[in-house]
């Protein structure tokens, strides 16, 4: 694509490789080697290139504006590693230093200057992983995600975050030890304030300087792929930092943000909202995400704050209705459809995940039926209900048992991912362990029960770092995790439990093979609120089945009976109360043979001891002939609604 064609398609919103044109690029012009700098500032009066190579003199290198509002200059003064900015004379005459929106590196905070950088061509060695990903996809594969804030998983003695070179040596072996299938990073793009956790971005094409060089992250991803671990990154296409030297009112007029003040300003987050209906902004954002997928071989993108992009009244502030008087943001809606359409056309095996908190449907529906086209939606309703239930005193749980069972009424309306994310362990919400009811023993018992329920419930999985071993305190973004907790035997056993649970998930196809239809689950009993016991069967494509029973109160139930559709000899393959995991049981239940007898819609029964505050999972060891094998005629098995 020549330069003029690149500009034309930029203006029509069809240039998705914009970073190859705008920004700083090494070139040869008339036999001279140097760099060409280009920046989009259509309403600026003047733009000058300044940097180390001009001793920061503001008027030494003027740039020339073309008909498309792009300013350009070639210079042989700039060298690899030099820091630079654009000195912009805005429409009103006010002058301001601005970042290069297309830079691939920035200097360390608190500086915001771009660094002249040509990304090296990496010779990737993850071809086998990519081939498998293309062949297998992810819908019928295990997806169990470890969510990480790269700046606080571990820190150096001086308090600085680990670089990706360090994370490669320590985090990847930890992922392997813990048997996760994927890692998801909170935003890695350049951001001026660490306390924003990366959710108020400045440089959309650049890796945050504190995390190391781009090639270090490439090597990290490659090493993950070598160990069969996928890499997902959070991305924020809805809003950006309000800082004057970044994207905000770049040329003195609304450039990246909406013209309408109410639509532009995000009061809740102190940010500015992208004008998602503007062609140039669409080119910018889609180019950004394709850049990250291409340069870093990412396996998934989690799109942050989708509700903010969909609803004009999402922010608790004055808002401007759409042309029909409603609150739906048509520009955001159509942008998200187009985003997923473009990404899926080129990268069908890259996951697109929506963090969307409303009750809107069709987030994962196809565009043809009015959907947005995401692969997965975070199930925030399930997460809120289930955490509220597990925090409650068991005496009262029978009155709120619908909090556990309600999800079965809507579980397949979207393709869901079940998140216990960073948002649930900050701002006074308590750590996952401290959310659990009771004394320390019962808190860990509840946590083992909860995590087993998450693994057995239909949907892909996500757990935030530190939660895997029951970290004592809330997450603090400016400190490393409380690794000293692992000196406590209860935390060490909790960590071992989570690693074994993750392996259990990977080993049993019925827990991930059919995640999006009732073919993958059969409810045995969702109405036993008096005992607060829930039971269901997870099913695979080739007849594999696991019987999952959850006792959600601290009362052991001897001679507990459930109905089953298949006669046979069953063995307990999972029990959250084993001593090795912090419980009190020395061994599993003995194998049990079903008995003929009417139990609800079933004519086979299984009787065993159900551990207090425990989860018990059974697998058929040998099928027996029976003339009375019955399948539950109500696969949802839930009569009660919220």
From Swiss-Prot:
One of its GO terms (cellular component) is cytosol. GO terms for molecular function: 1,4-alpha-glucan branching enzyme activity; cation binding; hydrolase activity, hydrolyzing O-glycosyl compounds. It comes from the Bacteria. InterPro entries: A-amylase/branching_C (IPR006048), Branching_enzy (IPR037439), GlgB (IPR006407), GlgB_N_E_set_prok (IPR044143), Glyco_hydro_13_cat_dom (IPR006047), Glyco_hydro_13_N (IPR004193), Glyco_hydro_b (IPR013780), Glycoside_hydrolase_SF (IPR017853). Pfam families: Alpha-amylase, Alpha-amylase_C, CBM_48. The active site is at residues 304, 355. Pathway: Glycan biosynthesis; glycogen biosynthesis. It catalyses: Transfers a segment of a (1->4)-alpha-D-glucan chain to a primary hydroxy group in a similar glucan chain. Its EC number is 2.4.1.18. One of its GO terms (biological process) is glycogen biosynthetic process. Keywords: Carbohydrate metabolism, Glycogen biosynthesis, Glycogen metabolism, Glycosyltransferase, Transferase. Catalyzes the formation of the alpha-1,6-glucosidic linkages in glycogen by scission of a 1,4-alpha-linked oligosaccharide from growing alpha-1,4-glucan chains and the subsequent attachment of the oligosaccharide to the alpha-1,6 position. Belongs to the glycosyl hydrolase 13 family. GlgB subfamily. Monomer. NCBIfam families: branching_enzym (TIGR01515), PRK05402.1 (NF003811), PRK12313.1 (NF008967). This is 1,4-alpha-glucan branching enzyme GlgB. It comes from Streptococcus pneumoniae (strain ATCC BAA-255 / R6). The gene is glgB.
